């Protein structure tokens, strides 16, 4: 149904939308979920890299039978990154490690939402996703959280034109 609706929008407007289902599941099911999403016409698949683990992101990204891009989502990251005395830095987890796992796109929070993400961390996550790093391809930043047409120009100013906007809540609330 989603892919048919996306195709109808394209025919009417000339703008292409990509359906990106969440395939996060038990580890033994994620790869099959990716294959099934691809068979059903999804243009991308999302895995919660925190809940499922970046190893699962890597397994799907490296599987030759999965030809659609993989988006690694960040839900739950705060439990690992927000303690100033323990854990892991969000720029390392969501930026560099997500990229090393092979994610084509990496979701991160926005400084324009109610979540208290520091601007410095936001910019360092994007930098780690996109900076030159040996022969690794960049990971496309997917900025989400409080995204709407009013703050899109600021995000493009912060991140550049090579950015995906995670507008799930904005669409659902419309």
Describe the function of each predicted region.
Residues 11-16, 134-138:
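Short helix-terminating capping/connector loops at secondary-structure junctions
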Residues 30-35, 40-168:
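Catalytic alpha/beta core domains of metabolic enzymes, predominantly
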Residues 15-25, 111-119:
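Glycine-rich phosphate-binding "P-loop"
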Residues 1, 19-20, 140-142:
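Short glycine-rich or small-residue beta-strand-to-loop segments that form or flank ligand, phosphate
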Residues 2-13, 21, 25-38:
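N-terminal active-site wall of soluble small-molecule enzyme domains
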Residues 170-173:
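A short, acidic, flexible beta-alpha connecting loop/helix-capping segment that sits on the rim
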């Amino acid at each position: 149904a989603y892919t048919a609706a996306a195709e109808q929008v394209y025919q009417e407007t000339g703008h292409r939308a990509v359906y990106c289902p969440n395939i996060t599941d038990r580890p033994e099911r994620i790869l099959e979920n990716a294959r099934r999403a691809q068979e059903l016409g999804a243009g991308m698949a999302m895995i919660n890299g925190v809940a499922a683990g970046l190893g699962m992101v890597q397994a799907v990204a490296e599987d030759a039978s999965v030809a659609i891009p993989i988006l690694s989502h960040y839900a739950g990251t705060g439990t690992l990154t927000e303690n100033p005395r323990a854990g892991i830095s969000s720029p390392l987890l969501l930026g560099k490690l997500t990229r090393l796992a092979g994610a084509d796109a990496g979701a991160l929070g926005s400084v324009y939402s109610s979540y208290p993400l520091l601007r410095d961390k936001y910019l360092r996550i994007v930098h780690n996703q996109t900076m030159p790093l040996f022969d690794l391809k960049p990971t496309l930043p997917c900025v989400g959280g409080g995204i709407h047409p009013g703050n899109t120009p600021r995000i493009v100013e912060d991140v550049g034109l090579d950015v995906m906007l995670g507008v799930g809540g904005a669409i659902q609330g419309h």
